[in-house]
Regions:
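Short, acidic/small-residue loops that bind anionic groups at enzyme active sites
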Residues: 35, 39-60
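N-terminal glycine-/serine-/threonine-rich phosphate-binding loop
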Residues: 1-42, 76, 121
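Short glycine-rich anion-binding loops that position phosphate/pyrophosphate groups of nucleotides
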Residues: 28-31, 50, 135-139
Length: 242
C-alpha cells in the first residue's frame, strides 16, 4: 500500500505533510480536530481504537476497517465530508487557524476592551471575550453559550440550537458577557461571518489580550493595543473520510 510514517501528536505542528498524503488518526475526537488544522486538505481517516469506551462522533472507523478505508481512499472511492475552517490574521502578518472555534479576549478572568467592526457597523465593547465557531465546532462551546442565552431569555428554540453544517461557508461569532456603559455597547453581540462579512477586532488592552484556537490556550497570538485582527473563512478546508 506504500510507505507509512508513525507520528506522535506533539510533532504535528512542525511536520511537513506531502500533498498526496493520506493521514490516519488513532485516538479520540480531539486528535482528529487537532490534526486537521495542520493539513492542507489531505484526507483524514479517523479510527476509534476503543468503541466500547468512546462514542467517537468524529471516528467513523474501527481498527478492523483501516485497510479497507485506506484502499478506497487511494482509489478515490471513499465518501468525504468537507470542513470549513476559521482564520484569524493580525495586522502584523501572524495567522492562526481553527477547526472548532477561536477565542479572542483576556488571558485571565478579566475584561477585554476592543473595537468590533462587522457588516458595516462598529462598536466599542467590554466583555469576557468573543467566541467564533465553525460548523464543525457548533455543537461544542457555541452550543453551550447559546443554551445559556436561551435559558436567560426564556426561549426554547433558535434556528442554530443544533448547530450548523460542517461545510457551510459561514462562521458564527458570539460576544461573552458584554458590559453596557457610557462608552461601551452591546448591540453587536451575535452574527454570521461570511465571505462578504468578515469580523474585525481592534484591541484596546495594554496587556493580557490573546487569540487562541480549539481550546489550546498555550498556543496563542498576542492581542494587545495596536493589534487589529480580521476573522474570516480560511482558504484551507478539512477533508474527513466517512
Amino acid at each position: 500500500m506504500g510507505r507509512f510514517q508513525l507520528l506522535e501528536r506533539r510533532l504535528l505542528p512542525n511536520y511537513q505533510f506531502g500533498p498526496t498524503d493520506i493521514v490516519v488518526t488513532i485516538g479520540q475526537d480531539g486528535l482528529v480536530a487537532n490534526t486537521l488544522k495542520y493539513l492542507e486538505g489531505q484526507p483524514v481517516i479517523a479510527i476509534n481504537p476503543d468503541p466500547g469506551r468512546w462514542d467517537g462522533k468524529l471516528l467513523p472507523f474501527e481498527i478492523g476497517e483501516l485497510q479497507s478505508a485506506v484502499t478506497k481512499t487511494i482509489a478515490g472511492k471513499s465518501a468525504c465530508k468537507t470542513i470549513t475552517f476559521a482564520e484569524a490574521k493580525t495586522n502584523d502578518g501572524q495567522r492562526i487557524l481553527a477547526v472548532n472555534d477561536l477565542f479572542v479576549g483576556p488571558k485571565s478572568h478579566t475584561s477585554a476592551r476592543y473595537l468590533l467592526s462587522w457588516n458595516g457597523r462598529e462598536e466599542t465593547q467590554s466583555s469576557s471575550g468573543i467566541i467564533i465557531s465553525t460548523g464543525f465546532g457548533s455543537t461544542g462551546w457555541f452550543q453551550s453559550i447559546l443554551a445559556g442565552a436561551l435559558g436567560v431569555s426564556g426561549s426554547e428554540s433558535h434556528p442554530l440550537k443544533k448547530g450548523f453544517a460542517w461545510h457551510e461557508q459561514r462562521l458564527q461569532f458570539t460576544v461573552r458577557e458584554p458590559f453596557p456603559s457610557l462608552t461601551t455597547g452591546t448591540s453587536l453581540v451575535f452574527g454570521a461571518i461570511t465571505l462578504a462579512t468578515p469580523l474585525k477586532l481592534e484591541s484596546q488592552m495594554p496587556e493580557n489580550g490573546v487569540i487562541f484556537s480549539d481550546g489550546i490556550e498555550t498556543d496563542y497570538l498576542a492581542f494587545n493595543s495596536g493589534t487589529v485582527v480580521t476573522i474570516s473563512l480560511a482558504a484551507t478546508q478539512g477533508q474527513l473520510i466517512v
